[in-house]
């Protein structure tokens, strides 16, 4: 079968990391590109399970989903090990994507001219190089802070070493380019802390080594958030483009499901009075921390909206739901973007995952951070010490007293007003960045010109 590539028609292979919140923002970007470049074919390659969810609603005709094997053998029984599904996928991903790209070319009869991939798929750099085509990775999972640290992993390891790491968490590192200082204990997992030989840690290390080879590196952020780090990253990459926040460039429709009535309930609350509690789809507080949050909310009489999995409700103090039925609302899921945009929300108690950070900046809501893993610690460091738009819960875990102190500080203390003012300032910068003449909009147009061949 003849495979062609005409000068007017391009073919971009989009390789997704099919876990957590990675695929959604990537597809959102591709949707924007597809609308602006109708002659370009975008072949979106992810697992069948991921694609089934992503493509349940109509997409532009020039975006086509294709499957890649998830690496789970037939009849496999999961042992519930950490990152078990990710590790299975990573073992077969390189070969799987290579075969999928070959199949896509046969079906479309159009040779792939670009590889746009989640940066977690570092091996896609080699795939693009073998084909002699451009590689455009996108850092979906974090901001410039975590990207910079992974870029300088070797420098950090050589400078800090590995001895006695467990007792050095509070040591301040002042040699990482772009950071005035950073607490050692807030480095992302896989740099110095955690199992450095795990497939996930190895993947993160290889990302930092591969990214300088990219034609263009994209990031789900906006330039004005991290000007110093952006200078460093610009000096390391041929082209570095902030094209977010994706929650503002591709906002969710207002008709998003609110089956549990969160928004009508919020409408009955006082302005900036409610604590919204949510830890994303992966992070999960321990039972004693669920108890601590509940006791702090009740003791402080803080109105609350809590997105809490049904499996965790069993850990709530006996009688808590009945005693606080007028004070708060617990739901298994909440439309977070809409919730954070509501005027009654005064604080967001969060794990500080990157999407949650961007969404709360867009809502102008200060944070109380409780990091769990991955980039949560470094995001929390930035929230408290650099951007000054929130606080880390004392000791990094929830106790009744630490949670009450954090709530009082953000909702009642003078510092809370400063946090609110600062995040309001960042909100305005983010909105300006995605405006018609904003930095993220200009960067998107730059990317569009590169892909369509008008700015090679």
UniProtKB/Swiss-Prot annotation:
Gene Ontology molecular function: cyanidin 3-O-galactosyltransferase activity; quercetin 3-O-glucosyltransferase activity; quercetin 7-O-glucosyltransferase activity
Tissue: Expressed at low levels in stems and leaves. Expressed in ovaries.
Pfam families per record: UDPGT
Top-level taxonomic group: Eukaryota
Keywords: Flavonoid biosynthesis, Glycosyltransferase, Transferase
Catalyses which reaction(s): cyanidin + UDP-alpha-D-galactose = cyanidin 3-O-beta-D-galactoside + UDP + H(+)
Enzyme class: transferase
Catalytic residues of the enzyme: 22, 118
Keyword Glycosyltransferase: yes
Entry binding sites for UDP: 281, 333-334, 351, 355-356, 359
Biological process (GO), any one: anthocyanin-containing compound biosynthetic process
PROSITE patterns to which the protein is assigned, alphabetical: UDPGT
Residues annotated to bind an anthocyanidin: 20, 22, 83, 150, 374
UniProt xrefs under PANTHER family: GLUCOSYL/GLUCURONOSYL TRANSFERASES, UDP-GLYCOSYLTRANSFERASE 74E1-RELATED
Function text: Involved in anthocyanin biosynthesis by catalyzing the galactosylation of cyanidin. Required for the accumulation of anthocyanin in red-fleshed kiwifruit varieties. Seems to be the key enzyme regulating the accumulation of anthocyanin in red-fleshed kiwi fruits.
Protein family membership: Belongs to the UDP-glycosyltransferase family.
Protein name per the record: Anthocyanidin 3-O-galactosyltransferase F3GT1
Gene designation per UniProt: F3GT1
